[in-house]
Amino acid sequence: MPSFDKPTDQQEATRDAQGADSRAATEVALFEAFGGVRGMVETTVPGLVFVAIYTVKRDIHIAAIAALGLSLLLGIARLVRKDTLKHAFSGVFGVAFGAVFAMMSGDAKNFYLPGMLYTLGLAVGYIVSALAGYPLMGLILGPVFKENLSWRTRNPGRKVAYTKASWAWGLILLAKSAVLFPLYWWGDVTQLGWVKVALGIPPMLLSVYLTWIFLSKAPPPIDVFAEMEAAERAEREREATAR
């Protein structure tokens, strides 16, 4: 006699398959949202070019123009590949601010200051938003998973996951800032540059990995767009039946 208290092997296999599909979809969506490995590399390479050229030439203008030129080429390449404008130009603007700031101030360390301030501000934003009950990671990824803000009011498990992810991002970026700002104040530009390059990809990968862990254990997202389409379809069917 079959037991109705325990799931059958087929049901367990179906759940495992659905869970694997959900984790895979989460992984793909996360890497898409943050530009993928290529995006991480592209945000690091201009800084590497700047510090390498400055170490050899000791010329702020040559180093800054080279870094900015490379960033523009990478952005154009993304446009040719029909990537999103966000991924194509987000790095370009950051490098441009740093290049202009360094050349105007005459201090090569200022090439890195806009990015450092952005990182610190982002860290504070993640932590404050988590404390306020509106985790920034949920606001960023909600549209990616087609759930918008449904995670906050209708899916408490997702809210918990987004809160944990926001804390993870905030603390990791805060730790990164705690390393970089003392080097900016008391170190030289080569020390700051090489350490900043070294701290480019690993913290990002760790943050994305922890986000994936939290979301893969959370309930699946509620597709609000599918719900709206279903409601519109049902409304059209009712109208057709009433005629």
Question: Can you describe what each PLM-predicted range is?
Answer:
Residues 1-35, 232-233:
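Short, Lys/Arg-rich, polar N-terminal cytosolic tail immediately upstream
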Residues 17-32, 45-56, 72-82, 161:
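Short juxtamembrane and helix-loop transition motifs at transmembrane-helix boundaries
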Residues 47-55, 72-76, 99-103, 124-127, ...:
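Alpha-helical transmembrane segments of multipass membrane proteins
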Residues 53-69, 88:
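Structural signature of hydrophobic alpha-helical transmembrane segments
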Residues 80-84, 104-112, 189-190:
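Membrane-interface helix caps and helix-loop-helix hairpins in membrane proteins
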Residues 85-96, 112-119:
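Cytoplasmic-side transmembrane-helix entry/capping segments in multi-pass membrane proteins
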Residues 109-160:
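Membrane-proximal helix-loop-helix units in multi-pass membrane proteins
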Residues 145-243:
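C-terminal membrane-adjacent module
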